[in-house]
Amino acid sequence: PVRVLLLESGEPCNMAYFAPVQLAPEKEDAASASVWRDGSALRAENPRCPYKDVRVTLRCSAPWVSAGTDARFLCGEDSGALRRGFPALAGAFRLEKEAVMLLGTADVPALLDIARAREALAKTKAWWAQRVRGEKYSAAMPESVRRLAPWSAYAALCCRVLGRGSLYQSGGAVGFRDQLQDRINLLPVDAAGARAHILACCAHQYAEGDVQHWYHPTGGEIDKGVRTDCSDDLLWLPWAVCEYVRATADESLCAETAPYLTSPPLARGEHSRYETPSLSGETGTVLDHCHRAAALVLRRGIGEHRLLRMGGGDWNDGFDAMGESAESVWLTWFASGVFHDFS
């Protein structure tokens, strides 16, 4: 992908652009990134990036005034707190009237042409207008809701689904429960996307029934993710299947197949493990995947108050240290609703 910025000014001016570079899962890994000038472009890469051959490029159609490769570009050479380890794509440019700036992992210098950039913007707007057009929403909705719905769908698709981010976190991982909720909420505009995502989630379930709480798609056969004893995430799979079938009447999804993952089960006292699992050699229908999720919830049992156990946290991740005896009112409600719909 590439971000295209169309810049305009009523009079000539200097402008600066600054983008810190991480390109890795952890902030500490940013120190391994390298940034260099390559002709009319700035490029950056990080050997700690989990994706192969990823390189970010910054270009601008306006003349370069200066370029920088770290935070000293903004804060000065004498800033003791900003030594090597804070790499950045940074540049100052002379904007006469209008210009195009490109930043992304795709290097498309042809878009520096202002006419082409405007054409790309028009095509992008048309694509989104078709994707989230208002007539996809129920006429029974209040007019104000129908007017806002396309914008909400646009924001959810861009941020949550494509960007895998949020206001509070931009980790780039796929949250098992989070994106199932996002995809189901977007059924009016992208039922096919919801179907495909349900199948992808099935492929991130362990043979025992639990799931990767979140994972980083790598484009390979198996994604690296975290195995947890979270009590609710696996239940969002049968919930999503029920919601999808109810909305689309497409029961064929239930007969689709997907593999199971395998790894050593979490040891007693081990609440999570970041790992690359293996394929178990087993496959099952979507219906089977849902059955295994429900069965594991029941096997985990109930507590003193006959409520389902909290485990490593329910929908509220902040309850991850409540202990083995903790019970969850919310989880019991949710499971009851899912089991009722699934039956």
Label the model's feature ranges.
Residues 3-173, 264-280, 287, 343:
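Acidic/polar, glycine-enriched structural segments that form the non-catalytic walls/loops
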Residues 336-343:
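N-terminal leader/propeptide and maturation segments of large enzyme subunits in energy/redox metabolism
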